[in-house]
């Protein structure tokens, strides 16, 4: 028999015997340490339940939406958003959404943007170097 095969088989046999001896012992899920942790976990669970009930009571105290105004009316009303909420960025957002952007860029199409950024072909590219 080859010495390398004999060594590997011997190691496998020793590993198997070691694991089989460990398997003969019982390993309960709950040990003596888990019994001492139980009151602490129970107290934590009680505090969590109290906190959840407080939050639910607080949500019920929050003033509900007015009965005459629906969700769509609230969303569309100008009073729903503060006056300075959109601010100066609103016009920029509208410009980006509009179809004029493609006409102002001078590009043949969106797919040429990568070519245009490298060589300037197909777009009126302003170099800022």
Swiss-Prot record:
Subcellular location field: Secreted
GO cellular component annotations of the record: cytoplasm; extracellular space
Alphabetically ordered keywords of this record: Disulfide bond, Hormone, Secreted, Signal, Vasoactive
Sites marked Cleavage: 99-101
Processing after translation: The precursor molecule is proteolytically cleaved, possibly by FURIN or CORIN, to produce the active peptide. May undergo further proteolytic cleavage by various proteases such as DPP4, MME and possibly FAP, to give rise to a variety of shorter peptides. May be cleaved at Pro-99 by the prolyl endopeptidase FAP (seprase) activity (in vitro). May be degraded by IDE. During IDE degradation, the resulting products initially increase the activation of NPR1 and can also stimulate NPR2 to produce cGMP before the fragments are completely degraded and inactivated by IDE (in vitro).
Keyword Transcription regulation set for record: no
N-terminal signal peptide: 1-26
Molecular functions (GO terms): hormone activity; hormone receptor binding
Cystine connections: 107-123
Record InterPro entries: Natr_peptide (IPR000663), Natr_peptide_CS (IPR030480), Natriuretic_peptide (IPR050787), Natriuretic_peptide_brain (IPR002408)
Lineage: superkingdom: Eukaryota
Matching Pfam families: ANP (PF00212)
GO biological process, one term: neuropeptide signaling pathway
Job of this protein: Cardiac hormone that plays a key role in mediating cardio-renal homeostasis. May also function as a paracrine antifibrotic factor in the heart. Acts by specifically binding and stimulating NPR1 to produce cGMP, which in turn activates effector proteins that drive various biological responses. Involved in regulating the extracellular fluid volume and maintaining the fluid-electrolyte balance through natriuresis, diuresis, vasorelaxation, and inhibition of renin and aldosterone secretion. Binds the clearance receptor NPR3.
Family as reported in the entry's similarity comment: Belongs to the natriuretic peptide family.
Protein name: Natriuretic peptides B
């Amino acid at each position: 028999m080859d010495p390398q095969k004999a060594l590997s088989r011997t190691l496998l046999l020793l590993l198997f015997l070691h694991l089989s001896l460990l398997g003969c012992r019982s390993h309960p899920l709950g040990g003596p340490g888990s019994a001492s942790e139980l009151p602490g976990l129970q107290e934590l669970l009680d505090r969590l339940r109290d906190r959840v009930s407080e939050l639910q009571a607080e949500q019920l105290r929050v003033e509900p939406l007015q009965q005459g105004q629906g969700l769509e009316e609230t969303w569309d009303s100008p009073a729903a958003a503060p006056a300075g909420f959109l601010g100066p960025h609103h016009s920029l957002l509208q410009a980006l959404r509009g179809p004029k952007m493609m006409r102002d860029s001078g590009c043949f199409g969106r797919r040429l943007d990568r070519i245009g950024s490298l060589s300037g072909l197909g777009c009126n590219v302003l170099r800022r170097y």
